[in-house]
UniProtKB/Swiss-Prot annotation:
The keyword Cytoplasm applies. It comes from the Bacteria. Mg(2+) 1 binds at residues 80, 98, 100. Binds 2 magnesium ions per subunit. It is an enzyme of class 3 (hydrolase). The lineage of its organism: Bacteria, Pseudomonadati, Pseudomonadota, Alphaproteobacteria, Rhodobacterales. This is Fructose-1,6-bisphosphatase class 1 2. It comes from Cereibacter sphaeroides (Rhodobacter sphaeroides). It catalyses: beta-D-fructose 1,6-bisphosphate + H2O = beta-D-fructose 6-phosphate + phosphate. Disulfide bonds: none annotated.
Amino acid sequence: MAIELEDLGLSPDVADVMQRLARVGAGIARIISRNGLERDLGAGVGTNAGGDGQKALDVIADDAFRAALEGSAVAYYASEEQDEVVTLGEGSLALAIDPLDGSSNIDVNVSIGTIFSIFPAAAGPEASFLRPGTEQIAGGYIIYGPQCALVCSFGQGVQHWVLDLDAGIFRRMPDIRPLPAETSEFAINASNYRHWPQPIRAFVDDLVAGAEGPRGKNFNMRWIASLVAETHRILMRGGVFLYPGDERKGYERGRLRHVYECAPIAFLIANVGGGATDGCADILTALPDRLHARTPFVFGCASKVARVAAYHDLACEETSALFGSRGLFRS
């Protein structure tokens, strides 16, 4: 046994897949803890299907998860590191995975993770994944940080496990609590301010204005450049995350993958009462048009996610009036 799954009512096939994912996750945690002692896990080794640079650990993780799922109920394996869906067999399930999220942080000892999503297998490989996120059986992640933890939803709340290093087992913890209605934290890469669309600038400017601004309170900004780490913080204490599309070539639809990253995170957030959109529309009801499709992504406390969408609904003149001559880097 690699993870405690009692009393969750999972089908034998899903429970078996979770055991396999947990077993690989525990192994990857051990590999990460020895980075630099035997090999450089952050060394560049090529590019993936989306054109992003691959690190050694990206490939190690992808190979490990793929191998572990052979012989399971997973018929189709879709990975951010693979060009196409890999057919593993004739099982009843399909699994999408970002084997190693946040790999730019490998060499600086910042939390990284694995994001995964389980669907019922459809009639063919791509059809199993180009579908609404509401059809997920499970969505979750493993975070490799000061603790190695696994967080997953099967559609009823969000469950939480922590890796017991001595036993090599993910121990069940109390479920994640519903997200708070209000928050004083937001996460966005402010260095891209000049490229953002006006509604995003307006929203952030109003937060930065603090107690004297239209929100009437002070906010703190966070940015880790690891989606798993950002998600874990928001699940633990609330907040809102924004990765908008912007004016730069290749960033028009943001940089996060709909299938491998955004759909499973949105599934988690929805199951603790939060919201997840592309800035305007619900991520979970959207249909990706290709495996490696990207999407802008806003998620977290429902009220803040709804407010971002409201800023997009305003005409440009109205949005400008909200913050007048203010800007993130102007008084």
